[in-house]
Amino acid sequence: MWVTRLLPVLLLQHVLLHLLLLPIAIPYAEGQKKRRNTLHEFKRSAKTTLIKEDPLLKIKTKKMNTADQCANRCIRNKGLPFTCKAFVFDKARKRCLWFPFNSMSSGVKKEFGHEFDLYENKDYIRNCIIGKGGSYKGTVSITKSGIKCQPWNSMIPHEHSFLPSSYRGKDLQENYCRNPRGEEGGPWCFTSNPEVRYEVCDIPQCSEVECMTCNGESYRGPMDHTETGKICQRWDHQTPHRHKFLPERYPDKGFDDNYCRNPDGKPRPWCYTLDPDTPWEYCAIKMCAHSTMNDTDLPMQTTECIQGQGEGYRGTINTIWNGIPCQRWDSQYPHQHDITPENFKCKDLRENYCRNPDGAESPWCFTTDPNIRVGYCSQIPKCDVSSGQDCYRGNGKNYMGSLSKTRSGLTCSMWDKNMEDLHRHIFWEPDATKLNKNYCRNPDDDAHGPWCYTGNPLIPWDYCPISRCEGDTTPTIVNLDHPVISCAKTKQLRVVNGIPTRTNVGWMVSLKYRNKHICGGSLIKESWILTARQCFPSRNKDLKDYEAWLGIHDVHGRGDEKRKQVLNVTQLVYGPEGSDLVLLKLARPAILDDFVSTIDLPNYGCTIPEKTTCSVYGWGYTGLINSDGLLRVAHLYIMGNEKCSQYHQGKVTLNESEICAGAENIVSGPCEGDYGGPLVCEQHKMRMVLGVIVPGRGCAIPNRPGIFVRVAYYAKWIHKIILTYKAPQL
């Protein structure tokens, strides 16, 4: 017996009303389409419009401010006398043109138009289905067994109730296969055979159609949802998830619409999702039957030298730059990782050879030293260094070659369009006769070689991939007489045998990755941190998982809650080639107070006298099993490069970009966790960051002084970045 039969009528009405008013929890997968930005449902073709050759085809146009507004009206067919399948946004006139056709329709042709962007509803151009195929609106009209479909508005030979007027929005047009009720089996139709009432159509799943080679770095297909069915976020949008993978910043990564891609060396393609609680997920793309890469997809393979970033290096070097042996790729000791031969099948992760599977700056490996997780194999020479116009001498101020791309692959912009910016940071009139077209040049006497403007607001300028000519010994710093101090940050390196410090070190930064301390750093300006490149081995790293903690003494922030400042990192600027430096742009400026301050940079090219006592700071490995997590300081003295080389038994030759410091008697020095942190010296009552801690041979080894990046050598580059990188960074 039903309980409702026993209820008085008024009580029953009250219960029903209460049930109707209860909030309905819609699962994300079902509700996301209504909430998401409708532009995700369109495929964009830049600088393209559609021209109708059939005069009977209709067009609707109206002035609107954005493509998003055009998309909303197209999806809802609001105020349109037809079913909208595509639209064009006129960027110059801020006008929408809606079409009942698309580029696949007869009587229509594509045409180039610089001010136009064409957006086509994916449901009408997709030749595969997602899930049950409820959104499929393609033109297949034959069943799985080959029978022609019956038109939906016809009752011959089969009568039915699936009339187009009864299923608005389901596009029951012509005799195309559809799934208006979202039933199992996928799109179907009534057949033209009187003996067969209906049958499913043979339309494949998109996950079956799409395939990839290797790890999918070269995948450029239209998969736009994750393996759990979540719709991907457009790469040119910053909601619901902010990210750095902007199409204009990475023009070679194929960031079209919201399609799955693999820009950062993950095991397979992925995307950000429209679910606010799920930042990203992998996509379900199978391996191609013959999983071989085209010649155009393969990096140039070399065995004796590296080309570009060394992604094609297949040699047998198996130590990092300072001689520490590499850990085997198929081993999880001493360092656990997921960059295994199984996950990166095409990257030749054999033995313990140096490789670059993830698009880092150069080949690298995990090391066999438990205190040093990764290291670069920078001792591998570059390929094709010649003595002609492909290289430069000195600092490259006389380079007159025709290269017009930056080291990150961006095309250089014309010099004559950037003269105002150039005048802003140099104090003399540049030689305009040398500034040809958009060729790499060095008009400001940059110590680190030719460069160019890019036209990209996120990367205003960058160095060009040109090496110094072989055998060139021209010094890049002419005068080395000025007092110097440098500042830097490091990766997980810890000051061994240091003492706890409560002195004024408000410029010390703890860099966190997912709340775990990985490196130190120095606050050199309110919005800028100096640290080590080894803390960010991949240029394509997503920065949203990184934070900078300032004003703390305890690495976990215990007892520092009132003075602690936690800031997001929005941009990573790599230093000149071989510098091991990185500048981090903060999402907002740090607030300077009694606990947070900046530290000074040294003068460019300066030196500091030998035996000057300096200090290194860090939260890294301490030599103790149970670390207290407190900031430590170790006092070292400056040592001349020649003497430093002797302590290293002649195995290390220091150059003008390095500085050496060691402890007098006890075993003190930086270790993993301290990387990126500063070597701080005082001169003329001014404290400066003279060096940056980078990985070395071992950790606080007796009679083995530390080698630091010499900040004074890169001081002009640091000032140039701070002056020119003014645009908001994402």
Curated annotation (Swiss-Prot):
Entries under InterPro entries matching the protein: Hepatocyte_GF, HGF/MST1, Kringle, Kringle-like, Kringle_CS, Kringle_sf, Pan_app, Peptidase_S1_PA
Cellular-component GO terms for this entry: extracellular space
Sites bearing Pyrrolidone carboxylic acid, chain numbering: 32
SUPFAM superfamilies: Hairpin loop containing domain-like, Kringle-like, Trypsin-like serine proteases
Domain Kringle: 128-206, 211-288, 305-383, 391-469
PROSITE patterns reported for this sequence: KRINGLE_1, KRINGLE_2, PAN, TRYPSIN_DOM
A single GO molecular function term of this UniProt record: signaling receptor binding
All copies of domain Peptidase S1, residue ranges: 495-723
Disulfides per UniProt: 70-96, 74-84, 128-206, 149-189, 177-201, 211-288, 232-271, 260-283, 305-383, 326-365, 354-377, 391-469, 412-452, 440-464, 487-606, 519-535, 614-681, 644-660, 671-699
Keyword Transmembrane helix found: no
PTM comment text: The single-chain precursor undergoes proteolytic processing by TMPRSS13 resulting in an active two-chain form. The single-chain precursor undergoes proteolytic processing by HGFAC resulting in an active two-chain form.
Keywords: Disulfide bond, Glycoprotein, Growth factor, Kringle, Pyrrolidone carboxylic acid, Repeat, Serine protease homolog, Signal
One annotated GO biological process: proteolysis
Family: Belongs to the peptidase S1 family. Plasminogen subfamily.
Role according to the record: Potent mitogen for mature parenchymal hepatocyte cells, seems to be a hepatotrophic factor, and acts as a growth factor for a broad spectrum of tissues and cell types. Activating ligand for the receptor tyrosine kinase MET by binding to it and promoting its dimerization. Activates MAPK signaling following TMPRSS13 cleavage and activation.
Name of the protein this chain belongs to: Hepatocyte growth factor
Organism: Bos taurus (Bovine)
Gene: HGF
